[in-house]
Amino acid sequence: ILTFIFFFGMPYIIQVLAPGFSANKEAFDLAVHFGKIIFPYLIFISLVAHFASINNVHGKFVAGAFAPAILNISLILSLFILTPQLSTAGHALSYGVLIGGLFQFIYLYKAVLKFYRPRIRIPHFDKKLKKFLRLFFPGLIGSGVIQLNIVIGTIIASFLPIGAISHIYYADRLNQLPLAIFG
């Protein structure tokens, strides 16, 4: 439901996340268009994270660790295959993200089905769940600060020349590289 709402509210989301784009109609329209293409990826990545967690709990780490490679392969292939058919490489990459998310979801769902059948259950509020919830919110705040820094950086960069948001993104990727390599 939220994805549907955000899909149609994308112009307002772009105004909040990249207010500097409002001064450049072409950049704003492209951001809205790409946002509408990519936003459904959030459904896939949420399910991917859920299924990767189920795998990890059961001691199966390979599928969750390999899932980002599926997205990277999808992005590379989309550049080569889709760019000639579409108007820009940005369009190809936007669709590549969506396709990659779908393949990540399928891959992890199949990995989970090998040993577990997902089902919806009503949680019992026992000691373990209370402890989890007590530890969850400080962890959420801690990880949220990093994401908030990225959002603030994006807002500021939207007022700078074209390419500044990409530089912020690349800097974040470099910042995460040691964690990705050494875990």
Please identify what each model-predicted range represents:
Residues 1-183:
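Membrane-embedded alpha-helical bundles of multi-pass transporters/translocases
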